């Protein structure tokens, strides 16, 4: 397909599709393509992302990595690293106020008891739970609990929890 340069207005005639993207790397089925008011990307002929006038759309099978946190007296969470986190508690801890918060960010923090168990977790001021009641973690050795969160503002994280999930 030829590319037409339209003066200072941009490039035209490069629409493509998921199976034959307009802009390709070494694979002819991987790249970026365009449709009306849409920019999308494909890998091996399958659409992996789509950006249109409503925002970014991710297919149902999209997944985010679970980022390991460092166990410490105050557990630090850098929200710029991802959305989902995991830590094994090696003692009674505090979940610190995260850095790099973005309103609307959401995810899960998995909390695992170490082999001893009976570890407790306190929460710094940004973490907000229903009715102001923080969860009491499952104390069984190796138990897993989860904090489900959405960042409301840069100083307020709305949370809920799931206890003893595995």
Map each language-model feature to its residues.
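Beta-strand-rich receptor-binding modules of extracellular spikes/adhesins
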Residues: 2-10, 27-59, 156
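A mid-sequence, solvent-exposed acidic-amphipathic segment
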Residues: 77, 85-88
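Short, intrinsically disordered N-terminal pre-domain segments
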Residues: 1-15, 163-166
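Extracellular/surface-exposed low-complexity repeats and stalk/linker segments enriched in Gly/Pro
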Residues: 10-30, 90-94, 126-134
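Extracellular beta-solenoid/beta-roll
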Residues: 56-81
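Acidic, glycine/polar-enriched metal-coordinating patches/loops
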Residues: 87-166
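Short, hydrophobic/aromatic-rich segments at coil-to-beta transitions
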Residues: 16-22, 37-38, 80-84
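Residue-level marker for the onset of beta-strands and adjacent loop->beta junctions
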Residues: 19, 28, 37, 47, ...
